[in-house]
Amino acid sequence: MNDTIPATGHLLGAADIRRIAADAGISPTKKFGQNFVIDPGTVRRIVREAGVTAADHVMEVGPGLGSLTLAILETGATMTAVEIDPPLAERLPGTVAEFMPEATSRLTVVNRDALTVTPENVPDFSDDASFTLVANLPYNVATPILLTLLERFDNLGSFLVMVQKEVADRLAAKPGSKIYGTPSVKLAWYGTAERVGTIGRNVFWPAPNVDSALVRFTRYQADDPAAPGASNSTADGGTQRELVFRLIDAAFGQRRKTLHAALKTIAPSEAFSIAGIDPTRRGETLTIAEFTALAKAIESCGDGDEAQ
């Protein structure tokens, strides 16, 4: 995207973080799930795992006081940081100007809730064939943020995020495991996820009560035959995703029930036969490909709402 050379500057340590917070009158809040990274080695590791280069356009959600922001900018990348907290959004450009002044022109800060971000109100990525998300996500909204951005931005090609360890395990879980659930299978609609490392509690201020982990995700290419939605047009010209996600929600909303019982208002009996799926199985055993096959079968039977 650009031929910018990597920037030189100073990444934030614990003393820097506390000084910036004090100068700006900022205290970490539970409301926004704020735990600021105080270890330069950790943010460099995140950027390294994400594979960010000067050619990339990066979105960061929840930049906080700028620890990860500076590490991303250090690569020479261009980035847009989405911050919900007004004082933090206002402070971030000044922090970059202080610690990495030559990188200020490559940073755009958007004061907005990430769950409200769309290509229309944040058009920064409209000209990109693909962009990446690199973030230390607020633990309480990590999964909704990821699924929302993947739904709204077709060109969000990959992400590397730090989340609560239990959330990371669920995002990367495979069918049949006890932690496989709605986040796992919905994320699998878009691409492949894997856990790529753990992060200790002592690299944060304040230290959280839980461990953290890194999740790497790669989106399916449009022509990838492995993509569940590779052939996803429906009779009404929309996509199958809405029906597939409806099946997922119903199946995991009553995960101990058989598919026949959990999906009785959505899937007619013949749909299971058409899809080649045993209706006595539970939703926690189905792959995203099987949920997609069942959705296609329901469409071929007509209106799933009339299932008996």
From Swiss-Prot:
Record: residues binding S-adenosyl-L-methionine: 35, 37, 62, 83, 113, 136
First-tier enzyme category under EC: transferase
**Which terms does the record give in the GO molecular function aspect?**
16S rRNA (adenine(1518)-N(6)/adenine(1519)-N(6))-dimethyltransferase activity; RNA binding
Q: Which reaction does it catalyse?
A: adenosine(1518)/adenosine(1519) in 16S rRNA + 4 S-adenosyl-L-methionine = N(6)-dimethyladenosine(1518)/N(6)-dimethyladenosine(1519) in 16S rRNA + 4 S-adenosyl-L-homocysteine + 4 H(+)
Question: Where would you find this protein in the cell?
Answer: Cytoplasm
Q: Does the keyword Transport apply?
A: no
Q: Which PROSITE patterns match?
A: RRNA_A_DIMETH, SAM_RNA_A_N6_MT
Q: Which GO terms describe its cellular component?
A: cytosol
**Alphabetical keyword list:** Cytoplasm, Methyltransferase, RNA-binding, rRNA processing, S-adenosyl-L-methionine, Transferase
Mention any Pfam family matching this sequence: RrnaAD
User: What's its EC?
Assistant: 2.1.1.182
Principal localisation: cytoplasm
Q: Which domain of life is it from?
A: Bacteria
What is the annotated role of this protein in its UniProt record?
Answer: Specifically dimethylates two adjacent adenosines (A1518 and A1519) in the loop of a conserved hairpin near the 3'-end of 16S rRNA in the 30S particle. May play a critical role in biogenesis of 30S subunits.
Per the record, the similarity remark reads: Belongs to the class I-like SAM-binding methyltransferase superfamily. rRNA adenine N(6)-methyltransferase family. RsmA subfamily.
What is this protein's record name?
Ribosomal RNA small subunit methyltransferase A
